[in-house]
């Protein structure tokens, strides 16, 4: 599939290509692809919203995610690499399909759970960690985008808490059902080994074994993402003994 963003749309002065540039290229590619999937998700969400304010909010989020993707592409150019994106890559396509099943059911709450609670928890935690170790403006960009994504989670919490207050058992069952679908895919994506083959985003071999060279690891990113996810579920009021069991059953 052709990339959704023109990676050569503007001329930015590049720094010299460092030995770690190919690693950051793949990290950026995963992040950029995730942002474009999020933009597609929010655009689809706008189409099922009845409230004009909700439509405008979803479209604003979509524009923000496209801006994040463009920022990641720009950071790649600064270090002399082209950042690819592939929203049809194996895992990202599955995540997109999970969201679109909620769209097909016109399940607004389900859409919020998938995008704002599950996918955004992953983004906030992983971007925050990358932001701490990536050099210069690359780290600053990841940290800044993590902070913006955190606002998306905060925005959804009031809506979802109100929904849970109507029927906690029904709400928790919905979250668990979506967890089995979406979080299983995310867990596989962050597993130590890609047991299902190449992820179709990394430009060469899987980047995960090389993450140690830039003070990262797949296990660390997975752990941070799951901790953020559990914290978010706790903020919703879902019992911790239940959510810990859910996470313990995810593939490793």
Task: Label each PLM-derived region with a short phrase.
Residues 1-252:
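Non-heme di-metal
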